[in-house]
Amino acid sequence: MKKIMTAINNPKLNEELKKEKKFEIVGKDIQYKEAILEILEKNSNIDLIILSEKIPGEIKLEKLIEKIKLMNEKIKIIFILEKENNDLAKILIKNNITDIYYNNKINLNELIKIINKKEINM
C-alpha cells in the first residue's frame, strides 16, 4: 500500500484520496510547508508527496525539496502548479521532480491514475 502525504491546500481532495483502497493517506492535508518536514521527521517512510505551489510557508521551495530528499531520498513528489511557470518548472526539474501538473488541467481521476502508475520502491 502506498503511503501518501498531501500538501495541496485542498482538504476535499485529501478526503477523496482516502477512499482509495490502494493508498494510505498520512494525516490531513498539510496547510504549510514546514509541516511537511515536521511530519517526515515522525514518519519518514512516506512513498509519495503531492505538493502544490499554493502551500504557504517561510521556507523557500528549493530548500524544502532539498530537505525532503535528505529525509527520504526515495520519496516521489508530484507537483501541482496553478498556472504555467517556466522558472518554477526549471527549479523542479533541476531537483528531479518531473511529475508536474497544472491545477486547472488535472482532476481527481487523473491524479489517481498517475499515482497508481508511479513506481514506488516499497
Which residues make up each language-model segment?
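Conserved acidic segment of CheY-like receiver
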Residues: 1-10, 17, 49-50
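A short, hydrophobic beta-strand element within the central beta-sheet of small alpha/beta folds
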Residues: 74-84
